[in-house]
């Protein structure tokens, strides 16, 4: 799993739930709080020069959010007359997005403050603009400060971002006011291991049986940088594994970047999502400029606003306190809620540091070293967080057993709520979302062969593997049900109704051995592997779709 890693002060972790008040009555607060003062071990270099270019993404509020939440509940309930009546993007804009007048008021304000290239997303939930440190200070009543952070140059806002009170109910957050999240690229691999798998091995291990390939379903991968080599690797994997060549479309989000440091991550995503599915109608690769919160938020918003794919996978994350404080959590949660109402699902890696949250660069796959906190976006209510197991198969390739992978992320969200579908089985909290929702093979010691830079290598794993595997399973299920399953949360939890009775046929292997630090595997839902791992054929028979 690719992580956004950074060092934060104790104040950042302990004060995460606090909201900051407006500096003056003429201003209204947004969800973007002060980041600069909370950065530990950062050397203040003074104010960011006024002329420094700054790109911002201004996130807007969903209107009538409670009604939209209720709508999602209705369309995922087989007993409700609205069951299966998912929204189209135009329906969302007409019923739940900010009005054209509200959007124009923000656009006009940004232009009046010197911002250029002001562009509104089709769903009216985000406005991108280019400005300077000076225009940021004037428009959002906050100073950008320069820092030396872990040997790198960074900047962050010294105070909460605010907007004029006339836009207080319109603007949710101002993203792009910091770049303090530092990307680490640890390789989740071990030396050659005899139990390594290829995509088709998982069809047998996880009992695809007669469940059809995902050939009728479009899926998406969330990536960063130049993915041309990733597509070349995918073609080699398909050719050498005897798989069909899936149609690939790259959607550039923001400025193109030449970065290829995440190629192993995106190779895992593409090869093992489409490989697990056996085929898909289209594989969309959303390629953003960087994995800063601001750029990722724009990418997630694209996914919802366009509704090109039924589901997607994100093999990256960040300690959830950071997106809460910089406001991107609210922006992303809005995108995920829209996606759920439109019948779309996002799967996300739960992390590779066990029950602890990585707040500094460390050795991948080793729990500890950070606060007991979960990764975002896996912790988002409307995202399916995917944990990890160690998979053991029989000599014929069939399923033998699994135990919890000790480094798989899990725990309780301090900021996002447990969804109505999870609440009945989440005995660990009456409020916070439990992570993960499901799990798949992730241990690099039971990992996979990967085509990387034109050659097949071994052995890769992490929740960067389990998330795209889950996406591939879901593509099969969607195709089997004519793409009518909608948002996966309720369907998956309803498919696990036999848990915790081992005698009851369910759609999941209930993992009851192992742990990830603070948490231990238990019968039923737990904070190590969620509901468990997929038995695809049984789950296909257990879930229902609208007629």
Where are these regions (language model features)?
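Bacterial N-terminal signal peptides
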Residues: 9-20
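Substrate-binding/charge-relay-adjacent region of secreted/lumenal peptidase catalytic domains
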Residues: 25-123, 128-388, 412-462, 467, ...
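An often Trp-containing, charged/polar helix-loop segment at the C-terminal end
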Residues: 390, 425, 471-474, 478-527, ...
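Acidic, glycine-rich loop-and-strand cores that form catalytic or ligand-binding grooves
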Residues: 411-414, 418-420, 496-504
């Amino acid at each position: 799993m690719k992580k956004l890693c950074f060092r934060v002060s104790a104040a950042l972790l302990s004060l995460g739930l606090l909201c900051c008040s407006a500096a003056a009555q003429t201003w209204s607060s947004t969800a973007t709080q002060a980041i600069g003062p909370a950065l530990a071990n950062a050397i203040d270099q003074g104010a960011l020069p006024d002329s420094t270019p700054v790109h911002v993404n201004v996130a807007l509020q969903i209107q009538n959010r409670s009604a939209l939440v209720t709508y999602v509940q209705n369309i995922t309930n087989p007993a409700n007359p609205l069951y299966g009546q998912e929204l189209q993007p135009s329906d969302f804009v007409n019923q739940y997005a900010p009005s054209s007048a509200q959007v124009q008021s923000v656009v006009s304000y940004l232009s009046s403050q010197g911002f250029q290239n002001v562009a509104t997303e089709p769903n009216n939930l985000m406005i991108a603009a280019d400005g300077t440190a000076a225009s940021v200070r004037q428009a959002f009543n906050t100073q950008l400060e320069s820092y030396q952070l872990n040997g790198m140059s960074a900047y962050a806002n010294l105070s909460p971002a605010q907007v004029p009170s006339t836009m207080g109910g319109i603007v949710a957050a101002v993203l792009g006011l910091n770049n303090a999240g530092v990307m680490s690229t640890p390789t989740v691999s071990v030396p050659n291991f005899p139990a390594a798998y290829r995509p088709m091995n998982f069809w047998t291990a996880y009992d695809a049986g007669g469940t059809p390939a995902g050939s009728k379903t479009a899926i998406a991968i969330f990536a960063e940088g130049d993915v041309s080599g990733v597509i070349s690797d995918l073609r080699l994997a398909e050719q050498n594994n005897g798989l069909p060549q899936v149609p690939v479309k790259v959607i550039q989000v923001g400025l193109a970047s030449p970065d290829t440091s995440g190629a192993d991550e995106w190779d895992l995503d593409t090869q093992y999502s489409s490989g697990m599915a056996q085929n898909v109608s289209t594989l969309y690769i959303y390629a953003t400029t960087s994995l800063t919160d601001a750029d990722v938020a724009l990418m997630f918003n694209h996914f919802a606003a366009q509704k090109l794919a039924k589901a997607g996978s994100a093999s990256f994350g960040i300690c959830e306190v950071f997106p809460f404080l910089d406001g991107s959590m609210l922006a992303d949660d809005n995108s995920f809620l829209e996606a759920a109402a439109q019948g779309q699902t996002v799967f996300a890696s739960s992390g590779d540091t066990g029950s602890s949250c990585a707040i500094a660069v460390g050795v991948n796959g080793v729990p500890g070293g950070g606060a007991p906190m979960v990764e975002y976006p896996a912790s988002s209510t409307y995202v399916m967080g995917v944990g990890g197991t160690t998979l053991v198969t029989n000599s014929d390739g069939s399923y033998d057993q699994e135990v919890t992978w000790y480094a798989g992320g899990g725990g309780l969200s301090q900021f996002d709520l447990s969804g109505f579908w999870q609440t009945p089985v989440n005995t660990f909290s009456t409020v916070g979302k439990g992570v993960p929702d499901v799990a798949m093979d992730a241990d690099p010691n039971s990992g996979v062969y990967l085509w990387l830079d034109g050659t097949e290598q071994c052995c890769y794993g992490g929740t960067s593997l389990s998330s795209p595997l889950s996406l591939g399973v879901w593509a099969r299920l969607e195709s089997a049900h004519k793409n009518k399953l909608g948002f996966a949360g309720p369907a998956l939890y309803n498919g696990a109704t036999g848990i915790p009775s081992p005698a009851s046929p369910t759609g999941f292997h209930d993992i009851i051995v192992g742990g990830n630090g603070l948490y231990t595997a238990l019968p039923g839902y737990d904070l190590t592997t969620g509901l468990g791992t997929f038995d695809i054929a049984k789950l296909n028979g257990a879930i229902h779709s609208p007629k």
